[in-house]
Amino acid sequence: IWRREHIQYWEGYYKYEDGINYIVKDGKDIPVNTFIGCDPATDIDTKHSDFSVITVIAIDVNNELYVLEYERHRSVPTIGSKNPETGEILGKKGVVDIILELHQKYNCVSSTVEDVAMNRSIFQALNDERRRLNKFDIAVIPEKPGGTQKRNRIYSGLSARFSTGTVHLRKNMFDLIN
């Protein structure tokens, strides 16, 4: 288990130049690969609903992980309603819209979405939207939860990374810190 003192912080920014993703940290360009992870909530819209979380990470050659951005919302639709003539989103963005937007913004290698029965509509909507936009370069990988309790999966996956100081958050990422 990790503690607050295990949390590493980073200051810098992301850039894409000549077909390569970088984070710029301490004035140095560090080449990285970028990925998205998504844990969509599947419960109904209440004040106690779970959060849907979509996180963009960068990983460098030394396997250091930098959290670039995350979206954390309650009661997010699978996909937002769109104007049929312009394709412009009307109202609230959905999980699919956010994934596709972040995938393009950060030139991600792939996006992983937790694959449980209730999330199958997300995969269907992602495939439909990729087809509509002709964006077949966007790779979305289903991730089976594996039968262990969610808390155990989180701790086993992140504990070693945090305790060895290889996860770097921004100081303003309060939801991830607390």
Regions found by a protein language model. Give the residues of each.
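ATPase catalytic-site recognition across NTP-hydrolyzing enzymes
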Residues: I1-A41
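Short, conserved, surface-exposed binding loops centered on an aromatic residue
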Residues: Y22-D29, I44-H48, E101-K105
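A residue-level signal for beta-strand positions that form part of recognition/binding surfaces
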Residues: T34-F35, F51, E64, T166
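Structured core elements
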Residues: I36-G37, V56, T112
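An active-site-proximal beta-strand-loop segment
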Residues: C38-I54
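Mg2+-dependent endonuclease catalytic cores in nucleic-acid-processing enzymes, primarily RNase H-like
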Residues: D60-N178
